[in-house]
C-alpha cells in the first residue's frame, strides 16, 4: 500500500468536504487536514442542481487544494459526487464543467460504490469493532445509505432517496419555521413507510449501529447542548426522540442558538432527525455510534491501493 497523500473531495447535496490523508498498512487512515464548505448544490426549489453548481464545486476544490499545499507539497486529488449528481439530468455535464473550470475530474458514484466506500471508511475507525456484524448509515442531503456488513466487508447495501434536502423540499412548507404537529406526524408516517418498504418484516441481526454524515454530527452537538448523558459519540434511541421533538417545535434561529445546529443545516435538520429516528426504530437499535470516518476515508484507502 502506497504512502502517497490523497486529497479526497466529496461533493454532496448540502456540503462539499475534503480530507487530505494517507492510507496506513494496517487499514487505518492518517488524517492530515479536513474541511467542510456549506455549499449546497442541490436545489431547494426544484429537483436537480442549482444553476451555479459547477462553479460552487470548482471553487471549493481549488480552495481545498490551495489549503492542502500548506500541509503537503505532493498529493493527488480524487473528487467524487453522490446522489445530487447521480439523480440530476445534468449531473454528468455539470461534472464535465467542473473539470473544465478547475482541471479536476469528478467521478459520479453509483449507489453500490458510494455505500462500499462509506462502509470501508467507517470501518477504519479504530473505536469500532469491524469484526462484529455492523449496520452503517450515512444520511446526506440526497439519499440515505444503509450498509450491513461483518468482518470489515460489506454484505448488503440499500440506497434510499430520502435525503434531508429532498424530503424537506417535498414535504415541509416553511422549513425555517417550527413544524406543525401535522407536519411531524406526516414525516413520521412517511419514514415508517419508507423503512417498511426497504427492509420488510425482518432485519438481519447486528451488534452495532454506526452513523456518519452531517445529520449525525448535528444530533451529537444537539445532545451535548441539551446536556443529555452517555458517551460523547453515542446517542440512544430515547435521546434521538428528544432531539427530534426539540428541533421540530422551534424555528431555525432557536435550532442554531439553543441546539447548536450549524446555520447551513437549520432548515433540514427536522427531516434529518425524523429519518434517523425512524431508521433506529425499524432496526430495533437501542443506540447509534457516531464516526467521523466516512466516504472520504474510504476514498483515501481505495486510492492508496492504486
Predicted region positions:
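Helical "lid/coupling" subdomains associated with nucleotide-phosphate turnover
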Residues: 39-66, 70, 84-94, 100-133, ...
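A generic, well-ordered mixed alpha/beta core segment in the N-terminal half of proteins
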Residues: 135-143, 147
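Structural motif
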Residues: 15-17, 143, 216, 287
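N-terminal glycine-rich anion-binding loops that anchor highly charged ligand groups
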Residues: 27-38, 72
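Short beta-strand scaffold segments in enzyme catalytic cores
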Residues: 16-20, 144-148, 298-299
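N-terminal basic/disordered segments at the start of proteins
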Residues: 2-30
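Short glycine-aspartate micro-motif
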Residues: 6-10, 134-138, 209
Amino acid at each position: 500500500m502506497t504512502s502517497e497523500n490523497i486529497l479526497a473531495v466529496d461533493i454532496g447535496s448540502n456540503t462539499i468536504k475534503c480530507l487530505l490523508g494517507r492510507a496506513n498498512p494496517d487499514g487505518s487512515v492518517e488524517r492530515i487536514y479536513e474541511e467542510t464548505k456549506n455549499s449546497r448544490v442541490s436545489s431547494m426549489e426544484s429537483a436537480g442542481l442549482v444553476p451555479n453548481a459547477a462553479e460552487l464545486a470548482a471553487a471549493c476544490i481549488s480552495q481545498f487544494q490551495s489549503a492542502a499545499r500548506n500541509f503537503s507539497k505532493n498529493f493527488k486529488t480524487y473528487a467524487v459526487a453522490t446522489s445530487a449528481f447521480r439523480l440530476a439530468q445534468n449531473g454528468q455535464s455539470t461534472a464535465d464543467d467542473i473539470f473544465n473550470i478547475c482541471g479536476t475530474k469528478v467521478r459520479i458514484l453509483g449507489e453500490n460504490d458510494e455505500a462500499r466506500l462509506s462502509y470501508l471508511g467507517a470501518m477504519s475507525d479504530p473505536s469500532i469493532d469491524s469484526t462484529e456484524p455492523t449496520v452503517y448509515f450515512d444520511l446526506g442531503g440526497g439519499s440515505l445509505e444503509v450498509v450491513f456488513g461483518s468482518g470489515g466487508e460489506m454484505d448488503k447495501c440499500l440506497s434510499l432517496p430520502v435525503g434531508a434536502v429532498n424530503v424537506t423540499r417535498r414535504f415541509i412548507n416553511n422549513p425555517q419555521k417550527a413544524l406543525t404537529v401535522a407536519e411531524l406526524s406526516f414525516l413520521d408516517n412517511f419514514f415508517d413507510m419508507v423503512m417498511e418498504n426497504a427492509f420488510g418484516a425482518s432485519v438481519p441481526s447486528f451488534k452495532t449501529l454506526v452513523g456518519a454524515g452531517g445529520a449525525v454530527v448535528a444530533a451529537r452537538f444537539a445532545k451535548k447542548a441539551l446536556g443529555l448523558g452517555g458517551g460523547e459519540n453515542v446517542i440512544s434511541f430515547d435521546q434521538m426522540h428528544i432531539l427530534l421533538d426539540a428541533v421540530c417545535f422551534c424555528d431555525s434561529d432557536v435550532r442554531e442558538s439553543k441546539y447548536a445546529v450549524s446555520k447551513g443545516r437549520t432548515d433540514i435538520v427536522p427531516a434529518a432527525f425524523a429519518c434517523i429516528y425512524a431508521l433506529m426504530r425499524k432496526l430495533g437499535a437501542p443506540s447509534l455510534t457516531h464516526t467521523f470516518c466516512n466516504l472520504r476515508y474510504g476514498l483515501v484507502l481505495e486510492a492508496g491501493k492504486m
